């Protein structure tokens, strides 16, 4: 799939695209955003509610198989944490005030697989397992799902396999839950994937296929192999409605947490949410769920590395999955391994095009610096890609286009939710190395 040469030639002359080519950090406000209710909102709301109910049915099973979820009775959820100290550090670093409250959605602390992918990835595997068991007549929705631990179920599921292409975190979530249920799982991993993620999957009995190419190639190869096996279910990060629904459930969970903090998004108290974006499924699902709940009172921005701005490029050009960052000469090489995606999901891009407020890009060095600052100020440890959201309010208030967007709203009482997408499963020595890089970069910056 490649862009027509004439279209690409015209695009390369665009001044904004030139900034992307030069790997400059940019802020882009989406001119295609529409006000008002979402199309087919009732249908989507029903599907998301059904996904939530399915998670509830599986909760007793999850609580028993994964003891770390027992306290939450098998519900896979993360805390919402105010980051006033981090906000203060950034105000000092950028020498300007950032109005409003800053909250960190701590998906890096999600149980089982330690990232936002625990939402969509685990959900799709659970749905597949439930469908198989229901069709076989082994299970009814009214059953206590703890019976899924029995050998008759794990033996039954072992006849089936699951495949997925991943830069790391999606593979972890699907591999861990799939193996626990008894499925044979194969994760097709791109060159960007961290070694510790591959090692952990192999420890769980998952087959890891490694590729020297990027994420899109790993997905394509996984899809191709799965098509040859009628007993293999391929979880397609680029096109999956079920992954999307699993992520969308996060919106109602966040609403419950905001309600507990007496935060009611409105014209007077607008909600700004910043989500790191790879292929688009995770942030797309969360964004869609939030827009269903809060409508025009929530403003969602996607964050991408300067070397991998695939969703921004797809949205800005209107070409979606028909264009890749490599088409404009970018290398898709970034320390933000979870975001190292060259081609966006067209399914997600087209769905979120009318509701997304915008996108921005962030340099690797900034991610490391933010990682260190957050560790020091709040004792929260995220992996580099998960810090992309933290740069959102900075870009909103520091760039001309960001300020132009913010001026339309009452920012004094705005609430900024930064989505921390992964980190708790990173080995201690790797996290310490990230922290050292960030500390060194910050020191050099302060010496200038």
Curated annotation (Swiss-Prot):
Pfam families: PALP. GO terms for molecular function: D-serine ammonia-lyase activity; hydro-lyase activity; pyridoxal phosphate binding. The modification N6-(pyridoxal phosphate)lysine is found at residue 117. The keyword Metal-binding does not apply. Signal peptide: none annotated. It catalyses: D-serine = pyruvate + NH4(+). Its EC number is 4.3.1.18. Keywords: Lyase, Pyridoxal phosphate. Its cofactor is pyridoxal 5'-phosphate. PROSITE patterns: DEHYDRATASE_SER_THR (PS00165). Belongs to the serine/threonine dehydratase family. DsdA subfamily. This is Probable D-serine dehydratase. It comes from Bacillus subtilis (strain 168).
